[in-house]
Amino acid sequence: MSSTALAVKGVEISFETTTLAFDCAVPAKRIVAVAGASGSGKSTLFNIIAGFEQPGRGEVRILGEEMTGRAPAERPVSIIFQEHNLFAHLDVATNVGFGISPALRLDAANRTKVEDALARVGLAGFGKRLPPTLSGGERQRVALARAFVRHRPILLLDEPFAALDPGMRAEMRALISDLHEEEGNTILMITHHPDDVRALADSVLFLDRGRIVAHDEVDRFLGRRDIAAINRFLGNEG
């Protein structure tokens, strides 16, 4: 297995008025915060990695394998969005079961895996509940359970805590840290909060105007004063 989990090389994608360009390499088994102002290209980078958008040039390699031409379902990637992760009309266990089999062909062993996954995220006994009856934090825990039953080596978290209060954010950060330690996967997490960087990340990819302008270990990133956009993110201005 490659020691580099993710390599984005010479990737460019053009929209009507702008071209975004990305280059980065992420070591395996790390938690990487992906930060930057709204519109800096964070979600576009995730969409390219996951296969939802195709770049005009460049390549994406995951664990050394080139991803060009692979559909999202064929990539070793799970993604959790800020919201809309679950099917509201299906119970929690069924939502998690989709992570094992999209056709929901689950034998007894797989149903046990679903129950175990829910227990791991603190939702034992929630299998028959419907998503609309859950809190925002509980719904994100269900999405995490589904991601982890897939056992994909790359997990993309697109602002997973955005709708949560500070206490729930801290609980979710701790849960993700614990699950990451168990799984040994590589996590990229979009965030607008320096506290998420300090509490959870090993390193930071920082984007500004469609470019990755910094890729630093956390301590170095938190000490930077040379890039205005980073100063704004960290609240160092004024």
Curated annotation (Swiss-Prot):
GO terms for cellular component: plasma membrane. Its EC number is 7.6.2.15. It comes from the Bacteria. It catalyses: thiamine(out) + ATP + H2O = thiamine(in) + ADP + phosphate + H(+). Pfam families: ABC_tran. Keywords: ATP-binding, Cell inner membrane, Cell membrane, Membrane, Nucleotide-binding, Translocase, Transport. It is found in: Cell inner membrane. The keyword ATP-binding applies. Residues 1-234 form the ABC transporter domain. The keyword Acetylation does not apply. Gene3D superfamilies: P-loop containing nucleotide triphosphate hydrolases. GO terms for molecular function: ABC-type thiamine transporter activity; ATP binding; ATP hydrolysis activity. It is a peripheral membrane protein. InterPro entries: AAA+_ATPase, ABC_SmlMolc_Importer, ABC_transporter-like_ATP-bd, ABC_transporter-like_CS, P-loop_NTPase, Thiamine_ABC_ThiQ. ATP binds at G36, A37, S38, G39, S40, G41, K42, S43. PANTHER family: SPERMIDINE/PUTRESCINE IMPORT ATP-BINDING PROTEIN POTA (PTHR42781), THIAMINE IMPORT ATP-BINDING PROTEIN THIQ (PTHR42781:SF1). The complex is composed of two ATP-binding proteins (ThiQ), two transmembrane proteins (ThiP) and a solute-binding protein (ThiB). Belongs to the ABC transporter superfamily. Thiamine importer (TC 3.A.1.19.1) family. Part of the ABC transporter complex ThiBPQ involved in thiamine import. Responsible for energy coupling to the transport system. This is Thiamine import ATP-binding protein ThiQ. It comes from Rhizobium meliloti (strain 1021) (Ensifer meliloti). The lineage of its organism: Bacteria, Pseudomonadati, Pseudomonadota, Alphaproteobacteria, Hyphomicrobiales.
